[in-house]
Design a protein with these regions (language model features):
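Short conserved beta-strand and strand-loop elements enriched in small hydrophobics
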Residues: 83, 129-136, 192-196, 363-371
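Conserved hydrophobic positions within beta-strands
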Residues: 108-110, 144-146, 211, 234, ...
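Catalytic-histidine neighborhood of serine endopeptidases
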Residues: 112-155, 160-165, 172, 183
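Catalytic nucleophile loop of clan PA
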Residues: 109, 224-244, 316-319
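C-terminal recognition in membrane/secretory proteostasis and scaffolding
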Residues: 1-48, 121, 145, 159, ...
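Flexible, gly/ser-rich surface segments that form the specificity/activation loops bordering the active-site cleft
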Residues: 123, 167-170, 176-216, 249-256, ...
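A conserved glycine-rich beta-strand in the N-terminal activation segment of trypsin-fold
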Residues: 61-71, 90-116, 140-143, 177-179, ...
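N-terminal activation segment of mature serine protease catalytic domains
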Residues: 31-104, 116, 120-121, 129, ...
Length: 439
């Protein structure tokens, strides 16, 4: 019995082993078949495309900021100056008092071999005496004076005295200067360098960053602008000036603002001939339009900027623009219902107000307006309008008109007064509106 049982068990084991062997053999054959099929497929593909794998090179380009900007740093010696001013600040609420005395400092840069300097208007505001220092001459004082200033644009043009020019030429051979670049080609993420003398420090400092974008007429950069840096140049990687450092935000990090150099180039010829250059004004006030308003007026869709006020004797008033008109184009640039347009020099739309900043006095402008469904084409010249009765005054460059009667000061109301009085005279706030000032 035992032998029979053993034979049965042994037989069963042989059957299991045989079945397993057959299964294993089948698996091996299938694997070989798959491998042969894969190899044949690869051979077919290789025959079709003649594929020959080659080793690929890994290209790595690492340039540090120091390497990028070192050639620029070598070109800027003595082109960036530190500006000092003796300030006499007038109190317009008490103009009869002796002006408050003080000193301030800022930065600037030479723009030609004649010793002309660009800086911010606020750097030289109410300055009674001005002088500069440059790196190679240490603390030696070089006298400068104001040729022209545009306070609303925050730009001033200075010039070395003849004696100071000779000092620099004797020591350095010539007056070094920076080339003016093209701010219209700037785009977000472009690298820039801001130069100046922050916090009144004696040594030239540089900070690097990128173009963050444009905000109104300003270039916003990630390089911080500190007090004392104002008026210094903003350079591109080629060493060209693309902006004038102007403002920083104390409660923000890595935020600075610069004036596009192309705006400076537009007004530069006028600064040589006009001491106080005011910002031109088209002479209209506009509101956002709507599709419903456009249809109601019978004007084509999409609409343009809706004119709600026209200032008397302004450029567009003389050209025939009227209240209720809809402005569709200016110099071939199409306006939307918000008064904004696409221009070649900006990635984002710019407002009509910012566009006007790029117009120069005497420049011809063409307009397309619609009035109750009828198209009108207007061609006129951009002119400096007469100042409205209530305007801002600049004591450094124009006289202050006042009289004192029995301890009472009588003088024309100005924007300066409105800013100084603020909440103490709420009834005067309406005169901040341009239309109210002109009436």
């Amino acid at each position: 019995m035992i032998n029979s049982r053993q034979n049965i068990v042994i037989g069963a084991l042989l059957v299991v082993i045989g079945v397993g062997a057959l299964g294993f053999y089948g698996m091996i054959k299938r694997q070989q078949h798959l491998e042969q099929g894969y190899l044949q497929l690869c051979a077919d593909i290789e025959g079709v495309i003649d594929y020959k794998p080659e080793p690929q090179q890994v290209v790595e380009r690492v340039v540090s900021n120091a390497q990028l900007w070192r050639p620029v740093q070598e070109q800027i010696d003595d082109t960036v100056v530190q500006i000092f001013s003796q300030v006499a600040e007038i109190d317009l609420l008490q103009p009869y008092k002796t002006p408050a005395q003080g000193t301030s400092s800022g930065s600037g840069f030479f723009i030609n071999a004649e010793g002309d300097i660009i800086t911010n208007a606020h750097v030289v505001d109410q300055a009674k005496a001005l002088w500069i220092q440059i790196q190679s001459l240490g603390k030696r004082i070089l006298d400068v004076h104001v040729i022209g200033v545009s306070p609303e644009r925050d730009i001033a043009l200075l010039r070395l005295s003849d004696e100071s020019k000779e000092i620099i030429r004797k020591e350095l051979g010539s007056i070094p200067f920076l080339p003016l670049g093209d701010s219209d080609v700037l785009r977000r993420s472009d690298e820039v360098m801001a130069l100046g003398y922050p916090l009144g420090q004696q040594s030239l400092k540089s900070t690097t960053g990128v173009i963050s974008g444009h905000e109104n007429r300003w270039i916003q950069i990630s390089a911080p602008i500190n007090p004392g840096n104002s008026g210094g140049p903003l350079l591109n990687a080629h060493g060209d000036v693309v902006g004038v450092n102007s403002a920083g935000i104390t409660k923000a990090q890595n935020v600075g603002y610069a004036i596009p150099i192309n705006e400076v180039k537009i007004i530069l010829p006028d600064l040589y001939t006009v001491t106080l250059l005011r910002k031109p004004f088209l002479g209209i006030v506009f509101n956002n339009a709507t599709d419903a308003l456009t249809d109601y007026l019978g004007n084509p869709q999409p609409g343009g900027a809706y004119v709600v006020e026209v200032v008397k004797d302004s450029t567009l008033d003389k050209a025939g623009v009227k209240r209720g008109d809809m402005l569709y184009q200016i110099n071939t640039h199409t306006l939307d219902i918000y008064g904004e347009m696409r221009v070649p020099w900006a990635e984002d739309k710019v407002s009509l107000i910012d566009y006007v900043s790029r117009l120069s006095i005497g420049q011809e402008i063409s307009l397309i307006i619609y009035r109750n469904g009828a198209q009108h084409e207007i061609v006129t010249k951009f002119e400096q309008m007469a100042l409205p009765p209530i305007s801002e005054i600049y004591p450094s460059y124009e006289p202050i008109d006042y009289e004192v009667f029995g301890g009472m000061v009588v003088m024309p109301l100005t924007i300066n007064h409105l800013q100084l009085l603020g909440a103490r005279a709420p009834g005067l706030a309406k005169y901040m509106d341009i239309q109210q000032r002109a009436e």
